[in-house]
Amino acid sequence: MTVKVDKNYEQLLDRLYDRLPDKAQKSGQQNLPNLIVLQVGNTTIIRNFSEYCDRIRREDKLCMRYLLKELAAPGSLGENGQLVIQGKFSSQVVTMLMERFLKMYVQCSTCRSFDTILKRDKKVWIISCLACGAQTPVKQF
C-alpha cells in the first residue's frame, strides 16, 4: 500500500513542477540603478527614468503617473528617457516614492521577488510573479 502512495505522491509532484513557470532571471532590488535626480531651476529631472522602469518591468507612463500623482505636480517624459517634473523635489523624496511604488506594485507579496509583471484584468490590477507563480490583486492609483 505504501508503494502506491509513494508513486501517487511522485506523480503529484511531477504534475506540480510541470505547472510551475520556468524560473526567471533574478532581478532583485540590489540590481536596480540609483535614480539620478537633478534640480534645474524650478524643475526636477530624473535622468535614468526609462532605464529604471525597464529594469522593474513597468511602463514609463505608469510609473510617471504614479510619481506625478504622489508629488501632486505636472510633468512629462522627455527625450532620452528622462522624466521632467515641474517643481523642486529632493532626491530623497523621489527615491522614497519609488521605493513605495516597488513595494506596492512590483514586489511579490508571497516570495518577495521583484520578477513580476503587472497586468490588468477588467478593472483589477494583478501582480503576477514570474518566480513563484503567485497572483496578487493590488489597488489602483
UniProtKB/Swiss-Prot annotation:
InterPro entries: IF2/IF5, TIF2_bsu_arc, Transl_init_fac_IF2/IF5_dom, Transl_init_fac_IF2/IF5_N, Transl_init_fac_IF2/IF5_Zn-bd
Keywords per UniProt: Initiation factor, Protein biosynthesis
Domain of life: Archaea
A single GO molecular function term of this UniProt record: translation initiation factor activity
Gene3D superfamilies (UniProt xref): 3.30.30.170
Function field: eIF-2 functions in the early steps of protein synthesis by forming a ternary complex with GTP and initiator tRNA.
PANTHER family in alphabetical order: EUKARYOTIC TRANSLATION INITIATION FACTOR, EUKARYOTIC TRANSLATION INITIATION FACTOR 2 SUBUNIT 2
Subunit and interaction comment: Heterotrimer composed of an alpha, a beta and a gamma chain.
Family label: Belongs to the eIF-2-beta/eIF-5 family.
Designated name of the protein: Translation initiation factor 2 subunit beta
